[in-house]
A protein has these predicted regions:
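Eukaryote-biased recognition of intrinsically disordered, low-complexity regulatory segments
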Residues: 1-9
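N-terminal cofactor/phosphate-binding cores enriched in small/glycine residues
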Residues: 8-67, 76-81
Length: 152
């Protein structure tokens, strides 16, 4: 058992496996794309990055909670960092959002809106791949892949 300070608020924790779980249990919503509580930590998306009282940033999904930690989940620096991550993900993503079947239900689209991403300032230099529709039940479009690990 221990106590952390999250955004100025004291929060007690018991045996949570990572800082992200403590933060979410405290009612704070932090975005993630790759995290699943029942699967081993992947830590690829970095959207759950937080900042400690010394200015160190880290992925909250892969850091164990320690008594006395002071965490900031939504500082100006962290907001800019998350926005940049989404911009980079979109830059390497296909640009068919308006015609995509997931438009309006897309987690990446929702994050971009939530974080204020209006334009993609980076050029898309990603190579285009063929769609794999060889299965009658699954269509795999590698051009939509954002390397989150959810499909694995």
């Amino acid at each position: 058992m221990g106590t952390m300070t999250i955004d100025g608020r004291k929060v007690e924790f018991t045996d949570e496996k990572n800082v992200l779980t403590v933060i979410r249990n405290a009612g704070i919503n932090i975005p993630t794309l790759c995290y699943h509580s029942e699967v081993s930590t992947f830590g690829a998306c970095r959207l759950c990055t937080v900042e400690d009282d010394r200015g160190k940033t880290f992925a909250s999904c892969s850091e164990q909670p320690r008594d006395g930690m002071v965490i900031y989940t939504n500082s100006g620096r962290i907001k800019k960092y998350r926005k940049l991550i989404v911009e980079l993900l979109l830059a390497a993503h296909c640009r068919d959002c308006t015609t995509c079947v997931k438009s309006g239900e897309c987690i990446l689209q929702e994050l971009a809106h939530r974080l204020g991403v209006r334009d993609i300032r980076f050029e898309n230099t990603r190579e285009q791949h063929e769609i794999d529709d060889s299965s009658p039940s699954i269509i795999r479009d590698p051009n939509k892949c954002i390397l989150c690990g959810n499909c694995v």
